[in-house]
Amino acid sequence: MDVEGREHCLINQDLYHLGSRGIEYDLLPWMNGNGVPLMAYCPLAQAGRLRQGLVEDEAVRQVAAHHGITPLQVLLAFALHDEHVIAIPRSSSVRHILANWESRTIELTSDDLALLDDAFPLPTHKVPLDME
């Protein structure tokens, strides 16, 4: 896909987190292939009910236990595991900011990612962008 003026696009901001992976079908691969980084907003799924489902998910908890981190740090590490993704998590305290900062050094293993993929599968077809 050719996009006129794409050389002027320095970054694209989209909703992206473990429970909202629609952009991984075609948008994120196109962006990666064209040198357009993703700025992921809501990487911690700060949308109440959805966030609760993610942090309580057994796969997320297993990965957290494996690394000795919190489920929220797993969510942020997932968003950051692609080198072309930056994240803008909302933080309401110094403690949250520090936990988020530590997440940048967490390296999820291929087993971790496979476990998360099983629990939250990649899209198999184009889906509308989520609007949480």
Q: What do these predicted ranges mean?
A:
Residues 1-132:
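Beta/alpha (TIM)-barrel catalytic core signal, keyed to glycine-rich beta->alpha loops juxtaposed to Asp/Glu
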